[in-house]
Amino acid sequence: MSSDPHMLGIQGEQIAAAYLSRHGYRIIQRNYRYRRNEIDIIAKKHATICFIEVKTRASLEKGHPSEAVTPKKQKEIIKAAKSYLFSLGTDRCECRFDVIAILVRSMKQEEIGLYDLDHFTDAFQAE
């Protein structure tokens, strides 16, 4: 795993996408952008579209990774999700907002893959 925060985030998103695929999700799109807002992963499981925010950290020094999904960040994700649904020509569908939090246990190259992953389904709601 990289110690560079940007690379750590990219690696976390790769881990999350692989996890979702193994658990029956179909990845529709990664890094969907609407203006300055971004959704890390858009996936589908059964008939539900899942908008997934991935947060990866190398330590708990700044808190659990999921704590970085603040109310402000949630609003940004919701705006991007509405844009995505509009681009499909619908605003009526089964959808939810998930958070995947990854805490890397080791930054050593030979111990790559040592991490804790928490998947919070339906982590927040659009109002």
From Swiss-Prot:
It holds the Pfam family UPF0102. InterPro entries: Restrct_endonuc-II-like, tRNA_endonuc-like_dom_sf, UPF0102_YraN-like. GO terms for molecular function: nucleic acid binding. Belongs to the UPF0102 family. PANTHER family: UPF0102 PROTEIN YRAN (PTHR34039:SF1). NCBIfam families: PRK12497.1-3 (NF009150), PRK12497.3-3 (NF009154), YraN family protein (TIGR00252). HAMAP family: UPF0102 (MF_00048). This is UPF0102 protein Cpha266_0037. The lineage of its organism: Bacteria, Pseudomonadati, Chlorobiota, Chlorobiia, Chlorobiales.
